[in-house]
Amino acid sequence: MIDAKWVYTWKTDEQGWIVKAKSRLVARGFKQREGIDFGEIFAPTLSSSSVRLLSANACELDLDLWHFEVDQAFVQSHLDEDVFLRMPKGCGNLFGKVVRLNKTLYGLKQASRTWHSHLIRCLEKPRF
């Protein structure tokens, strides 16, 4: 079982006035234990030299490159294992209760790996 907490972000203008406030629920994944709370956590990343080489090859061959961002990427992918989360204050009548997560949450050790697996499955679909 993993605890959760709220993370708050405030955006301010030039005078320091708050113009936007956000909050998100994150898992306190640093308390997860390998082999008990999660299995594999490896997710490949692209080095900056690989990105430069890819860009140079695309320019030389006059190819188009596409770059995209995925909003809330980690919370798009399903978990492979059962993860139970204790809800923090600020969750109304769920405070203190334990819930089972269906999808990943920021802060989980396996979030990067599950997102990578989800992305690969989407890219391998015929209509991509």
Provide a role label for each language-model segment:
Residues 1-128:
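Long, low-complexity, charge-biased intrinsically disordered regions
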